[in-house]
Amino acid sequence: MFHILIGALLGLLFLATETRAQFQFFEQMFGGGGHQQQQDHREQNVASDSSWYQRNYDNAHCSDYLCPGTLACVSVPHHCPCQHPDVEDKFELGDGSAICISKGGFKANEAARKVELARKGLL
């Protein structure tokens, strides 16, 4: 009888420990729990308004033209780089301006070809 009681108590203790460990896992995975020391290591998100951008724009020094999208300093506006050059192609228009458009399919300069077709009214 004594062995059965000790076995039952040990089983309940083991079950309680496993349940607590399981909940701690979910708290960590989904950001719950409120453990202060874990939250101190997280980086803070940028503000949801334009204050971060405006602060960087105001502090940027450029003697020529400061590109509004990338804060790059270039000699003329159509030299501004695209914000996401890995997925965008830059296409210079004839009037001294430029646009950045999503890269086309598999062929080089496919996006530029589509812009030209659209300008001619063929697309």
From Swiss-Prot:
Signal peptide (residue range): 1-21
Keywords (A to Z) from UniProt: Signal
InterPro entries cross-referenced by the UniProt entry: LCL2
Q: Which GO terms describe its biological process?
A: ERAD pathway
Question: Which domain of life does the UniProt lineage start with?
Answer: Eukaryota
Q: Where are the transmembrane segments?
A: none
Function (record text)? Probable component of the endoplasmic reticulum-associated degradation (ERAD) pathway.
Q: Which family does it belong to?
A: Belongs to the LCL2 family.
> Which protein is depicted?
Long chronological lifespan protein 2
What organism does the record attribute this protein to?
Paracoccidioides brasiliensis (strain Pb18)
- From which lineage does this chain's organism come? Eukaryota, Fungi, Dikarya, Ascomycota, Pezizomycotina
Gene field: LCL2
